[in-house]
């Protein structure tokens, strides 16, 4: 997502990083602010948020947003929390890895992993399914409650 701010700054858009000219220069180009967010516009003109550009998983030439995969997995009644990240892969470059916290009383089994993978295959593009599924007790989070993908 890029915001045009020239000739005058747009209300609500920051003017730069405090005492960090290099970081400011990396997001401002010719009066345009590059947010680092990725979205797409449908035929009706609505914008759909995909995620952060630095979170995008690049697998076999495809660009996969973790937010879509997380949202799909969260539809399952036995999933309490989910975080999706990239895992290195020799053939594909990266693959989708899903770290999942199950509701109390549900056990993470190989059969459940396959069920989750098949669910994602049938509710998104088949290449987006998590090739790695890990069950965890909890997910690492920032102080504001956001999942720390780099720790998954």
Question: Which stretches of residues belong to each language-model region?
Answer:
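Adenylate-forming
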Residues: 18
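AMP-binding/adenylate-forming catalytic core of the ANL superfamily
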Residues: 4-10, 15, 23, 38-128, ...
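General small-molecule cofactor/ligand-binding pocket signal
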Residues: 133-136
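Glycine-rich active-site loop/lid that clamps phosphate-bearing ligands
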Residues: 1
